[in-house]
């Protein structure tokens, strides 16, 4: 084995190794999820060298510099103040979703007007209108980290694959018999998965446009789906109160997670794929061991339905958003609530951590988005100006831009 190059991954912090083995170029990653601005660099580099034979003494200085750069990134933008940069009268009907590419250079908006639009983040200019769907464009995504393709899922029962650069439609995936409400690319960007009101999920080959496999077994609509970090497994959450873990290559059921007593609103893996988090209309979140499929904790405290939930990149913190107008942060190890985020005057439908993991973004029916301090629960900023509920909000990869999308037909860029 011969090390060819070292590359940085900023969020979550890690060093990617490109090496040659048997004439083939391979990659692996050293995940530094515990890294903080106060970590002792020399100690950490010593630990890395103990476990990674490719990092020899001659590479010590280089690795030390890379770790220091990662620490700088964790300090950057972590206390950013956001100001309104642009209001985009994006669509003639309400927006359904917004999504950014990894570079943050452009973002997309889906709408009830049957289109998806591609926007330049720096200028707020419209780059493309993706037309062709015959009903609401509901689910949208970039194939991050690459960002050169866009998938759109529609109430017209089809999913379309587009070029992010030219706006050209590559494929229309047909096969669902009801509305498509969620979708996701696998991390390798070889497959797109769609979840539908027809109770199935389907995986589609991006190159050929062919259906790879259909995931059948749910008894009601699939409302949420996501891949694990490796792309080997996919998880689906349904209105039948269950979550199913599937083998992404064969479509075989690996686990059925039974325990919630109402519809599932969100289901996702932690970054290291060891835990699964599920949120439900039964007012609870449940934490599951991803290997055994056993429930390890039920997170309680909300007085109404949980509408969204997420992990931070370390997998140590969990955030939940509820129809009770509050959000909560839980410690994933102790399963205790650390902070309660209070201030919204309506239900919170979206929540996400910034890439640095020290801020939370929430979007609410009270027409505002808010930025919160994760540790104290203090509201740091209220992003005001929308005239109707906020459906969707997101940080860019650096954490210094926020996009909000609203029922008022507009989206706003904050930076």
Curated annotation (Swiss-Prot):
Q: Which Gene3D superfamilies is this protein grouped with?
A: YVTN repeat-like/Quinoprotein amine dehydrogenase
Q: Name one GO cellular component term.
A: cytoplasm
- Look up the coiled coil feature and give its residue ranges: none
Cell location: Cytoplasm, Cytoskeleton, Flagellum basal body; Cytoplasm, Cytoskeleton, Flagellum axoneme
Superkingdom of the source species: Eukaryota
Pfam families in the cross-refs: WD40
Which coarse location class applies to the principal site listed for this UniProt protein?
cytoplasm
User: Which SMART domains is this protein grouped with?
Assistant: WD40
WD repeat feature ranges: 90-129, 132-174, 175-214, 217-256, 259-298, 301-340, 343-384, 386-415
Any Gene Ontology biological process = cerebrospinal fluid circulation
Q: Which UniProt keywords apply?
A: Cell projection, Cilium, Cytoplasm, Cytoskeleton, Flagellum, Repeat, WD repeat
Question: What GO MF annotations does this protein's record show?
Answer: ubiquitin-like ligase-substrate adaptor activity
Instruction: Outline the subunit composition.
Output: Interacts with IFT46.
Q: What does this protein do?
A: Required for axonemal dynein assembly and ciliary motility in ciliated organs, including Kupffer's vesicle, during embryogenesis. Facilitates the onset of robust cilia motility during development.
Which family does this protein fall into?
A: Belongs to the WD repeat WDR69 family.
What's the protein name?
Answer: Dynein assembly factor with WD repeat domains 1
From which lineage does this chain's organism come? Eukaryota, Metazoa, Chordata, Craniata, Vertebrata
């Amino acid at each position: 084995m011969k090390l060819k190059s070292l590359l940085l991954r900023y969020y979550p912090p890690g060093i990617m190794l490109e090496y040659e083995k048997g004439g083939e170029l391979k990659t692996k990653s050293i995940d530094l999820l515990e890294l903080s601005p106060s970590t002792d660099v020399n100690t950490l580099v010593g630990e890395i060298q103990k476990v990674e034979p490719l990092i020899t003494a001659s590479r010590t200085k280089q690795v030390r510099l890379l770790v220091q750069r990662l620490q700088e990134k964790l300090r950057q933008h972590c206390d950013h103040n956001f100001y309104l940069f642009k209001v985009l009268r994006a669509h003639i009907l309400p927006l359904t979703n917004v999504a950014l590419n990894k570079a943050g250079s452009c973002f997309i908006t889906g709408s009830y007007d049957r289109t998806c639009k591609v926007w330049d983040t720096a200028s707020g200019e419209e780059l493309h209108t993706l037309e062709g769907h015959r009903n609401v464009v509901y689910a949208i995504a970039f194939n991050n980290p690459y960002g050169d393709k866009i998938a759109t899922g529609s109430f017209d029962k089809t999913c379309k694959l587009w070029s992010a650069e030219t706006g050209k439609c590559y494929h229309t995936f047909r096969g669902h018999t009801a509305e498509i409400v969620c979708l996701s690319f696998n991390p390798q960007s070889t497959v797109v998965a769609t979840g539908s009101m027809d109770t199935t999920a389907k995986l589609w080959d991006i190159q050929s446009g062919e259906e790879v496999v259909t995931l059948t077994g749910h008894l009601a609509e699939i409302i949420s789906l996501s891949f694990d970090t490796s792309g080997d497994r996919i998880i689906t959450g349904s209105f039948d109160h269950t979550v199913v873990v599937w083998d992404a290559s064969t479509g075989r059921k690996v686990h059925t997670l039974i325990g919630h007593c109402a519809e599932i609103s969100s289901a996702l893996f932690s970054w290291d794929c060891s835990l699964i988090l599920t949120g439900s209309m039964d007012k609870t979140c449940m934490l599951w061991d991803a290997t055994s499929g056993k429930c390890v904790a039920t997170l309680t405290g909300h007085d109404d339905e949980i509408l969204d939930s997420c992990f931070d990149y370390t997998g140590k913190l969990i955030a939940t958003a509820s129809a009770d107008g509050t959000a909560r942060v839980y410690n994933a190890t102790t399963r205790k609530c650390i902070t309660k985020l209070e201030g919204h005057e309506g239900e919170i439908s979206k929540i996400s951590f910034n890439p640095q993991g020290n801020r939370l973004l929430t979007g609410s029916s009270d027409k505002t988005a808010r930025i919160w301090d994760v540790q104290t629960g203090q509201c740091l900023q209220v992003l005001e100006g929308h005239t109707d509920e906020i459906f969707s909000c997101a940080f860019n990869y650096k954490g210094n831009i926020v996009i909000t999308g609203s029922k008022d037909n507009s989206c706003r860029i904050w930076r």
